[in-house]
């Protein structure tokens, strides 16, 4: 399962810090994220599920996406759960508690990553290419630290448009149907009516 949404923004866009932290809460934080809690822990539909956000440094090219590993017979249930969590985020937003916990996790992960020589070398190369220094990284972190739930919710509603998300599902669906027929179990329920077809 792979979902992708292209966004016209760079990593210097004013909305980018909020998009990054909003994604951390939705699916970037792995086990503590909303997608992992719902799809992996609650419903047991995927062992590996998450989301990501990115923005290029040179151009207004960015995006948001999500992924999940699943058994073919669970495809429709997984997509339905994914769409429900997306709708819940857009309608209800994130809480202050979720935002503060996401900040701590995101900053801690950054500290761990910066202890790796390969990461530092890559960043130095990027900074030379885009005429930046580590002061840029510090400023970005400070922007993330200053974010409120209201700011993040506004940015997520602005950029994450369900109808514009492309979804790709791959798997042995015919094999799953034959297996279900042989066992006498009904096929997986289809996605909820009214959801966009991809």
Can you describe what each PLM-predicted range is?
Residues 14-22, 144, 148-151, 156, ...:
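PPIase-associated folding chaperone regions across multiple families
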Residues 25, 127, 159:
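Conserved catalytic core of Hanks-type protein kinase domains
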Residues 1-32:
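His/Glu-based metal-binding/catalytic segments typifying zinc-dependent metallopeptidases
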Residues 22-23, 36, 40, 83, ...:
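Generic solvent-exposed, charged/amphipathic alpha-helical segments
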Residues 1-10, 36-146, 162-171, 178-195:
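M16 family metallopeptidases and their MPP-like homologs
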């Amino acid at each position: 399962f792979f979902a992708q949404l292209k966004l016209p923004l760079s990593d210097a866009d004013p909305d980018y810090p909020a998009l990054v932290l909003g994604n951390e809460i939705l699916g970037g934080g792995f086990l503590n994220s909303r997608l992992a809690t719902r799809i992996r822990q609650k419903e047991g539909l995927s062992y590996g599920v998450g989301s990501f956000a990115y923005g290029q440094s040179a151009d207004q090219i960015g995006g948001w996406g999500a992924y999940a590993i699943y058994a073919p017979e669970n495809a429709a249930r997984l997509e339905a759960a994914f769409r429900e969590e997306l709708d819940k985020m857009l309608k209800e937003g994130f809480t202050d508690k979720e935002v503060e916990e996401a900040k701590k996790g995101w900053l801690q992960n950054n500290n761990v990553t910066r202890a790796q020589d390969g990461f530092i070398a890559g960043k130095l190369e990027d900074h030379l290419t885009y005429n930046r220094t580590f002061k840029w990284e510090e400023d970005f972190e400070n922007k993330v630290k200053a974010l409120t739930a209201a700011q993040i919710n506004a940015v997520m509603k602005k950029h994450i448009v369900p109808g514009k998300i492309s979804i790709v599902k791959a798997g042995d669906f015919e094999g799953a149907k034959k297996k279900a027929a042989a066992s006498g179990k009904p096929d997986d329920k289809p996605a909820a009516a009214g959801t966009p077809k991809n």
